[in-house]
């Protein structure tokens, strides 16, 4: 095969620290707007975050493992670990908020299905 045949501009396909920095800042913006209960802003940030993740996944899927540098592989692992940690923290926060909001049975209206099921037993 002709070696010149394999030469291509891969700068757009290579992972860069900027790719990860952008995702991290978008994630932080989303979490901040979520915490502040700014629904519209959180929705926009989540959309941008999803787009960024999709673009990063496309870049990674097009790369051969041997094309990735050790630094890129470590960066991907760190991002995945951070995502897992953030998901755990978010779920823990949501769980603690749901435990703080205790609903009394008399405050909840029974649905017709619940009434039917109680009467059937």
From Swiss-Prot:
Comp. bias regions, Basic and acidic residues: 102-112
Record-level GO BP terms: positive regulation of transcription initiation by RNA polymerase II
Gene Ontology MF, one: transcription coactivator activity
TM ranges: none
Entry GO CC: mediator complex; nucleus
Region (Disordered): 101-121
Highest taxon of source: Eukaryota
Protein's name according to its UniProt entry: Uncharacterized protein C24C9.04
Organism: Schizosaccharomyces pombe (strain 972 / ATCC 24843)
Lineage of the species this protein comes from: Eukaryota, Fungi, Dikarya, Ascomycota, Taphrinomycotina
